Amino acid sequence: MMHYDVAVIGGGIAGYSAALRALQAGKKVVLINQGQSALHFSSGSIDVLGRLPDGSVVNQPFDALSALQQQVPEHPYSKVGRKNSEKGLMWFKRTLDSAHVPLHHEPDGANHWRITPLGTLKNTWLSQPFVYPYRGNADFSRIMIVAIDGYRDFQPAMLRDNLAQRPELANTPMLTVNVSIPGFEGFRRNPNELRSIDIARLLRQESAWNALCDQLMRVARPDDLVIMPAIMGNGDGLHLMSKLQQVTQLRFHEVPTMPPSLLGIRIEEALHRSFIQGGGVQLKGDKVIDGDFAGSRLTAIHTQNLRDFPISAEHYVMATGSYFSQGLQASQHAIQEPTFALDVQQNPDRAQWRHAQFIAAQSHPFMTFGVTTDANLHPSRQGKTIDNLWCCGAMLSGYDPVFEGCGGGVAIATAYHAVEQILATYAQTKQPEVLL
C-alpha cells in the first residue's frame, strides 16, 4: 500500500491548488487525475465574483462577499470567508508568478473587464500579462483586430460588430487586418483546418515569425490596441508574446479561442511543472473508482490502473469537478457523485431543475446542485460526515460559477481553505514549511 500525507483527487485548478499548497508546506502529496482538465477550455483569467445571485453586478469582489453571505449562507465563499478567500487568491498569484506566469489585478482591488472572442466584456479579477484590463476608459486611439488566414477558430467580424455596440467605443475606429503566415501548407489538408497549436508550432520558425511581425508593423501603431487570438505557446507563449511586443512596440490583447485554449494551457502547464519540480507524485491518466471507509474516515482509495495497490493518506482532498468533468453525474431523476456516493444537494422534483426559459434572468437551479458539505468543506456519506475528506471546486453545491462569474475564484479559495485546515492538524508536530 502506498501511503501519503495528502491525496488529491482531480487535476483541475482546484486539485492543483490543493496539491501545491500541501506540497509547499512539506507534505508528501499524490495527485490523481483522469485526463486533461477544463483549463484547456478556459479563458486563462481568474474570475472571483462578477455577479451576486440576485443579478447585481459586482465591482469590488471581496467587498461583495458580505452581501453574498446574506443572500446565500451556504455559498462556498460564505463557508471560506473573506479573509481566507483573499489569502487563497493572493497565494495563487504568488505561486503563478514564481512559475513564470505572472497574473495582474487592478491596484484598487476591483474587477476589470476582459474583451472576449465574441466582442463582449466579462468581469474578471486576475489576468495574464497580455490581457488588456479594460475599465471603461479607452486609452487607445484605434482597435486593430488580427485575422489569420486559414484559422477558423476566431471570428474577427463578430468581435468587431459586438464591441462596436459599446456606447463608450462608438467613436473608436475598429479595423480588421488579415495576416498570412508562410508555411501553413505543411500543416493542413484543407484551407480551414488550422488550430492554435499548429500556429504556435509554426511561429517557432524564423520566416513565419518575421512575416507576422512585418505585417503587424505595417498596419498598427503603438497607440492602437491590437486584438489577436491566443496563438503563442505551447510552453513558451508568454516569452513569445513579450518578444513580439518588443519587436513591434505594439500593445496586444490576447483572446482565448476554441479549444485548445493556449491561455488556459499556460496555467495548467505552470501548475503541473511546479508540482513535479516540487517533488509531488502524479498519477496522470488514472481514475479513482472507489474508497474504503471506516466510521467517519476514508482509509484508502482504489484507482482504475492500480486496482491491486490501494493508496492511503492521512487526508484526502476531492476536486473532481462538475458535470463536464464527471465529478457529478445526472440521470433522468437524480444527480449523483459517482466515486464515493457522497450526499448531493438537489431538488427531487426534476421539473424544478430549470427555468422555463433557457436564457433566463436568474441562474438555473441545477447549476447550484452539488456535493453537500459542512462549514469546513467536509462532505457526508449517507448522512455521516467524513472527517478526513475535503471537497472543493466545481463539485460543491450552493453556487453557479457561470451566472455568478466565480468559477476560478471558488476553486482556488476552497482548495486553499481545505489545505489550511489540513495543515492545522499538524500544528502540534511542527515541520519546516516553505512559503511563497
Swiss-Prot record:
InterPro entries in alphabetical order: FAD-dep_OxRdtase_2_FAD-bd, FAD/NAD-bd_sf, G3P_DH_GlpB_su, Metab_Enz_Cyan_OpOx_G3PDH
UniProt cofactor(s): FMN
Enzyme Commission code(s) on record: 1.1.5.3
Quaternary assembly: Composed of a catalytic GlpA/B dimer and of membrane bound GlpC.
GO cellular component: glycerol-3-phosphate dehydrogenase (FAD) complex
Stated name of the protein: Anaerobic glycerol-3-phosphate dehydrogenase subunit B
Pfam families assigned to the protein according to its UniProt record, in alphabetical order: FAD_binding_2
General function of this protein: Conversion of glycerol 3-phosphate to dihydroxyacetone. Uses fumarate or nitrate as electron acceptor.
Pathway: Polyol metabolism; glycerol degradation via glycerol kinase pathway; glycerone phosphate from sn-glycerol 3-phosphate (anaerobic route): step 1/1
NCBIfam families from the UniProt entry: glycerol3P_GlpB (TIGR03378), PRK05329.1-2 (NF003719), PRK05329.1-3 (NF003720)
Keywords from the named record: Flavoprotein, FMN, Oxidoreductase
Keyword Oxidoreductase: yes
